[in-house]
């Protein structure tokens, strides 16, 4: 079953945060996606992935 995860992408203090809703089976698949996004976009400094229960979350940053 696909769970709903919210990705918060922080590009820095001056630019507002961007929220994306994604569906995945496991949070680890989204962590890999977040790491790829960090490599491709130098403006992104932190990506927070919040799970549907708010108990499972992961932060990917440089």
Positions of predicted regions on the chain:
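Short aromatic-glycine-(Arg/Gly/Cys) micro-motifs in beta-strand/loop hairpins
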Residues: 1-17
